[in-house]
Amino acid sequence: LYGTAIPKGFNTIKPNEGDARLRFIGVKFIADGSTQGLTAALNEPYSYPAGTKIKGSLNYQTETLYNAVKPYFDQGWQIAIHANGDSAIDQALENYSKLLDKVDNPQTRRLRIEHFTITKPEQLVLTKKLGVVPGFTIGHVHYWGEPFHNQIVGAARANRIDPSASMKKEGVRFAYHSDSPVSP
């Protein structure tokens, strides 16, 4: 969901309701934008254009996102938060940590972060601790690796995009996906 409006009739649907062809299992919130469009929320400015102060932006204040996610979490929905930038990933992990602190069996909850693109090493540690499943847009590496490295975020951050090898080494479950037709 972008914003906090609840779609008409959505409150009548329960998690896992449906049939063999269509079942409702989750709700997705959009915490930031795209790295290629320089709208993903970063802690440090983008590298391009040179000298920029652009850091992208969060779509929600942290408390607003928490208050939007909590009712769905409490009803048992699988929650996914779109977070490309490290600032948005921080926000998603902070909210997930707060939500999981209030439940008896946190390991039974299915929480995802979609994209998990520009990362910091400590985010991988917290992701594992919380049991969050990152979903990587693996096309970023093939189609955008060079622009990330040379222009968008620079070498150091580009070397940490979509860190599936690090996640595998640490025993963290993760998924791959595509944003087709937006990108392959």
Region spans (language model):
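Active-site beta-loop-alpha junctions enriched in small/polar residues
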Residues: Y2-I6, V27-I30, H82-D86, F116-I118, ...
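Short acidic/histidine-rich active-site segments
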Residues: T35, W77-S87, F136-I138, M167-P184
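Distinct, well-ordered alpha-helical segments
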Residues: K8-I13, I89-K102
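Phosphate/diphosphate-binding loops
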Residues: L1-K28, T108-P121, P147-A175
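Histidine/acidic-residue-rich catalytic or RNA/ligand-binding cores of hydrolases
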Residues: I89-S97, W144-N150, S180-P184
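Active-site gating loops and adjacent loop-to-helix segments of metal-dependent hydrolytic enzymes
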Residues: T35-S57, L99-T108, V133-A155
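Active-site-adjacent helix-turn-beta-strand microarchitecture at beta-sheet edges
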Residues: L1-Q78, L124
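Long, K/E/R/D-enriched contiguous segments that form extended
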Residues: L65-Y72, D86-E94, E114, I118, ...
